[in-house]
Design a protein with these regions (language model features):
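Short acidic-glycine loop/turn motifs at beta-strand connectors
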Residues: 7, 36-40, 46-47, 110, ...
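C-terminal catalytic lobe of FAD-dependent flavoproteins
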Residues: 27-28, 38-47, 58-163, 217
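Short, surface-exposed beta-strand/loop micro-motifs that present aromatic residues
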Residues: 31-35, 104-106, 196-197, 205
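Flavin-dependent oxidoreductases
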Residues: 1-38, 181, 187
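A short, flexible beta-alpha/helix-coil linker loop
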Residues: 10, 56-59
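Active-site-flanking beta-strand signature of metal-NTP-handling nucleotidyl enzymes
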Residues: 50-53
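Rieske [2Fe-2S] iron-sulfur-binding domain
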Residues: 195-290, 294
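Mid-to-C-terminal Rossmann-like scaffold of FAD/NAD(P)H-dependent oxidoreductases
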Residues: 91-95, 151-191
Length: 294
């Protein structure tokens, strides 16, 4: 999560800072702060902008986004009391490797020579630069001392406990198949909101647009079959297992899923849900070696 607040120009020296909380080793919320000079934006005369991020959690596993924004703003005001009313806020998604190092190199799960750069843990600028050097060397056959360090196929024994916990967390999310829906009736669904509706053995992701129209699709993530959750702040369907995300109409936005949620139709007069005939599409592949999108 990120919030942006104005501060009097020059009241805080130019900086980029972060704390050492959070991550796999510690449960403390992780925070990072930077200053954007007002003249760089052209929209804040007499002010600089304080950009503060933090309050991370795994994608699809926390429904209280507003609470995280509130906590982040409170943390900011406690340390920067000169900050004015919040101007902007947004949330994003990053990939966290279990051993805290990015995956840069030949993809061990591909049948073709595919090179990847992922698992940035929020440090995309740094890892992007490293990847530019390392991948160039790998492609031209030049030795690079970082190759083994960032090898996507590496096995890090010291991170085995984290790996086991993350996979146990993923397995636990399949219990969503046993839970009740978010609403008992479509009449309970407000405009601009989405909810999981249970009809027999089916889980449906239903969204009511601002004009009152209803849109439905399967709530089953096409990657490995978890039930997606509604993200009311970003108006998206988020998979709590491996971090796939879909827009309010079920169109894929972020992998590992590479296709949309299966369509469904609504018979509004009977409040019934009809899914296409045939079995649910098979999962797209094995569980990745390093789950844990946040």
């Amino acid at each position: 999560y990120v919030v942006v607040l104005p501060i009097p120009r020059g009241s805080v020296h130019p900086l980029l800072l972060w704390d050492t909380g959070g991550g796999h080793a510690r449960p403390d919320p992780y925070h990072y702060v930077r200053i954007v000079r007002g003249e760089a934006t052209g929209r804040s005369p007499g002010h600089d902008l304080l950009v503060v991020g933090g309050e991370d959690h795994k994608t699809g596993q926390d429904a209280d986004a507003e609470g995280h924004y509130d906590a982040l703003e409170a943390w900011t005001r406690e340390r920067f009391p000169v900050a004015g009313p919040a101007l902007h806020r947004w949330s994003g998604q990053i990939l966290e490797p279990v051993d805290a190092l990015a995956h840069i190199g030949l993809d061990p799960g591909s049948n073709h020579p595919v090179y990847v750069a992922t698992g940035d843990s929020g440090n995309g600028m740094t890892h992007g630069t490293i990847a530019g050097v390392l991948l160039t060397d790998l492609l031209v056959g030049r030795e690079n001392p970082w190759e083994r360090l960032y090898d996507p196929g590496r096995v890090t024994l010291g991170a085995s406990g984290v790996y086991a916990r993350e996979n146990a967390n993923v397995a636990g999310r399949y219990a969503d198949w046993l839970r009740k829906g978010d609403v008992a009736s479509l009449d309970d669904l407000a405009r601009g909101a989405g909810a999981i509706l249970v009809r027999g053995l089916r889980r449906l992701a239903v969204y009511r647009d601002l004009e009152g129209g209803l849109h439905a699709c399967s709530a089953v993530c096409p990657h490995l079959g978890c039930v997606v959750h509604w993200n009311g702040v970003e108006s998206s369907w988020d998979c709590p297992c491996h971090g796939s995300r879909f827009d309010e109409l079920g169109r894929v936005v972020n992998g590992p899923a590479n296709r949309d949620l299966a369509p469904a139709t609504l018979d509004e007069s009977a409040r019934a849900v009809v899914l296409p005939e045939g079995p649910i599409p098979a999962p797209e592949g094995p569980i990745p070696a390093n789950p844990g999108a946040t």
